[in-house]
């Protein structure tokens, strides 16, 4: 029992002691928590103060930066406004000056207007006086002559009618003479062939081509029924086709070398093909003309290679090709051009000048002769215009214009080289025949005079210049106007050209209508 009591007392005391110890421990924990809380609060305050300071510092930096940017923008804006004010001030000053000038001009105009008004009034008075004088003179003339104005008009018209009758009489005489020539057509044909044969000794090498045929039966097929084939051929090619009694040969005559070559090739193809009629003739001639364009291009390219001058301009190359069929005083113009090119290059090399410039100028110096029968002007000017068109220098143009004396003074040593080389090529023995050139010039001028008339599309000088065949545009010239056109052309030829004998004017107006049957 005593042990139990001791145990109970011990347990009680132990519980009391444990309770007291828990109280003491709790108090100690509370103090520790309070201290920890105070320490945490102090640390948080310190962190908050540091963060606040950083935020304030950043804010100050941002404000400072924004302030500087704002001040910079304000400064730029003020500068812009200042510049605008300066410009406005300048414009105001300019406007003031212009207004002053306008005021002066208005003042001058008003003064001129007053002056013109006074002069106009004076002129009106003068015109009135002149009209009065004219009326007085008319009355005086009527009184002296004893005729009225209507009577004078009748006399004038009567004189004009008399002149017209005289012109009609001359025309009638020409028509009668032409009828007599047609009546003796065969003899005239033989005479023209004889003239061609005589001229051939002097010009056959440049104005005629002969085609050999296997037999004379082909001549009849070439002539065609009532000569329609030969007429169609001459019409399409612009040459004279001479079919005479010379065995197994046909002669083509034309002063234009390209026409003559086209006619020769076309006739050879027609003979080889065997089909010879107007439609086929027109078809073959058209094809040969197209082939001739390619041939001229190839000839020009070969000439450029032989000359040793680089050239890629297709038009220049074609014009050089045309020079192959152009002669000057009987001398081949392409051969002359190449000779001048080679001579100019050699001379320039010896003198230490620009060799390529001299060779190119020599190549172009006579290129206008390829089109001088189509374009107005001397061949010097035409050549210079072509060079200028394709961007050549003033020095080059001067060298071209000055290669003959009397046109332009040479402005460079190279220009003298071109003139010298041209003179050497032209002056060599046997190079030229002056009478041939005079004959060709006359035919070219004859064609040129005819082409000046309105409505003329093509003109061919034929029969050694004794006939001009003219093709007109049917839209511009009607049937009634063809007679007037022929009369006007004849008058102009009589006034401007010198020629032996007579020239027959033939105007052809042709209208074609095509339709396709489907």
Curated annotation (Swiss-Prot):
EC identifiers of the protein: 3.1.-.-
Enzymatic class: hydrolase
Membrane topology of this protein: Single-pass membrane protein
Top-rank taxon: Bacteria
Pfam family, one: HD
Domain HD: 333-427
Transmembrane region(s): 1-21
GO molecular-function term, one example from the UniProt record: RNA endonuclease activity
Subcellular location: Cell membrane
Chain ranges of the KH domain: 207-270
Keywords from the UniProt entry: Cell membrane, Endonuclease, Hydrolase, Membrane, Nuclease, RNA-binding, Transmembrane, Transmembrane helix
GO-annotated biological processes: mRNA catabolic process
Cellular component aspect of the GO annotation: plasma membrane
Keyword Transmembrane: yes
PROSITE patterns, per the entry: HD (PS51831), KH_TYPE_1 (PS50084)
HAMAP family cross-referenced by the UniProt entry: RNase_Y
Family the UniProt entry places it in: Belongs to the RNase Y family.
Protein's job: Endoribonuclease that initiates mRNA decay.
Protein name: Ribonuclease Y
Gene name per UniProt: rny
């Amino acid at each position: 029992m005593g042990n139990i009591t001791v145990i109970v007392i011990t347990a009680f005391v132990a519980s009391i002691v444990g309770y007291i110890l828990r109280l003491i421990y709790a108090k100690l924990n509370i103090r520790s928590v309070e201290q920890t809380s105070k320490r945490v609060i102090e640390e948080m305050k310190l962190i908050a103060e540091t963060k606040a300071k950083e935020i304030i510092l950043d804010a100050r930096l941002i404000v400072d930066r924004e302030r500087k940017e704002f001040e910079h923008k304000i400064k730029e804006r003020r500068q812009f406004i200042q510049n605008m004010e300066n410009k406005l001030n300048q414009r105001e000053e300019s406007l003031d000056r212009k207004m002053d000038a306008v005021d002066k001009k208005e003042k001058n105009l008003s003064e001129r207007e007053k002056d013109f008004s006074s002069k106009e009034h004076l002129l009106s008075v003068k015109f009135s006086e002149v009209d009065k004088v004219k009326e007085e003179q008319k009355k005086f003339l009527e009184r002296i002559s004893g005729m009225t104005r209507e009577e004078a008009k009748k006399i004038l018209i009567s004189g004009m009618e008399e002149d017209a009758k005289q012109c009609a009489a001359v025309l009638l005489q020409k028509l009668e003479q032409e009828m007599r020539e047609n009546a003796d057509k065969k003899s005239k044909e033989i005479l023209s062939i004889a003239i061609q044969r005589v001229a051939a000794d002097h010009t056959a090498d440049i104005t005629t081509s002969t085609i050999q045929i296997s037999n004379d039966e082909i001549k009849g097929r070439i002539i065609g029924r009532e000569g329609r084939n030969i007429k169609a051929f001459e019409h399409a090619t612009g040459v004279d086709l001479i079919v005479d009694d010379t065995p197994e040969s046909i002669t083509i005559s034309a002063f234009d070398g390209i026409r003559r070559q086209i006619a020769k090739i076309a006739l050879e193809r027609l003979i080889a093909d065997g089909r010879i009629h107007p439609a086929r003739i027109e078809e073959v001639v058209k094809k040969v003309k197209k082939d001739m364009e390619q041939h001229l291009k190839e000839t020009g390219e070969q000439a450029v290679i032989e000359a040793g001058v680089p050239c890629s301009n297709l038009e220049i190359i074609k014009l050089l090709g045309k020079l192959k069929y152009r002669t000057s005083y009987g001398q081949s113009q392409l051969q002359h051009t190449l000779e001048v090119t080679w001579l100019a290059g050699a001379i320039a090399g010896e003198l230490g000048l620009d060799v390529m410039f001299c060779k190119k100028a020599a190549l172009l110096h006579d290129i206008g002769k390829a089109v001088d029968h189509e374009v107005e002007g001397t061949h010097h000017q035409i050549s210079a215009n072509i060079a200028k068109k394709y961007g050549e220098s003033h020095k080059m143009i001067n060298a071209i214009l000055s290669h003959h004396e009397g046109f332009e003074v040479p402005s460079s040593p190279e220009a003298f080289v071109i003139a010298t080389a041209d003179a050497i090529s032209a002056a060599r023995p046997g190079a030229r025949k002056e009478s041939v050139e005079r004959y060709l010039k006359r035919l070219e001028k004859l064609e040129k005079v005819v082409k000046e008339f309105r409505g003329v599309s093509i003109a061919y000088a034929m029969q050694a210049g004794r006939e001009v065949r003219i093709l007109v545009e049917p839209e511009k010239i009607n049937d009634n106007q063809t007679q007037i056109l022929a009369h006007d052309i004849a008058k102009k030829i009589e006034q401007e050209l010198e020629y032996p004998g007579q020239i027959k004017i033939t105007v052809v107006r042709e209208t074609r209508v095509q339709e396709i049957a489907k």
